[in-house]
Amino acid sequence: MFIPEIEMKSVEEIKKSQEAHIPGLLEYLDKNSKYYRKVFQQNNIKISDIKAIEDLTKIPVTTKDNLQEESDDFLCVPRKDIVDFVTTSGTLGEPVTFAMTNKDLDRLAYNEFISFSCANTTENDIFQLMVTLDKRFMAGMAYFLGLRKLGAGIIRLGPGMQELQFESIMKFLPTGLITVPS
């Protein structure tokens, strides 16, 4: 099982790596995000003063309301670079839309790849995916992409259909099930 080197570093080494990226990230946001440029200006935040993780507390927390009301202002890339639009279910209010590039989807896959790797999942495993990849459920896509990156087998069924679920379990003999309790 391959786990990238950074995942095995000490807390101090990870923090040092993260802090090395802070200036470039903040400059990128200031240049490319209408939302964060406005936040920096309205709160008199000088991004060059933010050097450590602890300094990030100078930036106001982004709320769900911000995401709902100003979603387009978060975009940092041209719209032509957006390959996937996903909207939350809106369980606790209005749905929130996330526009993702290929790089964002790669990061989503990486996050789940690491999670599955930490659970000792390998390319020899087969998972029955009993959640949807659509219908405003972002985690389904994340699980799918993470398992693909890992090289594990995937049986895509989605939720419900108990008889088909059991038939597939008997036919394909998955080593794991991915479900969400309701």
What do the PLM-derived regions correspond to, one by one?
Residues 174-182:
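Adenylate-forming
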Residues 154-169:
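ATP-dependent adenylate-forming carboxylate-activation enzymes
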Residues 113, 117-146, 150:
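Conserved AMP-binding loop of ANL adenylate-forming enzymes
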Residues 82, 105, 132-135, 182:
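Short glycine-enriched loops at secondary-structure junctions
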Residues 23, 125, 175:
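Conserved acidic residues
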Residues 1-87, 93-110, 114, 118:
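Nucleotide 5′-phosphate-binding alpha/beta core
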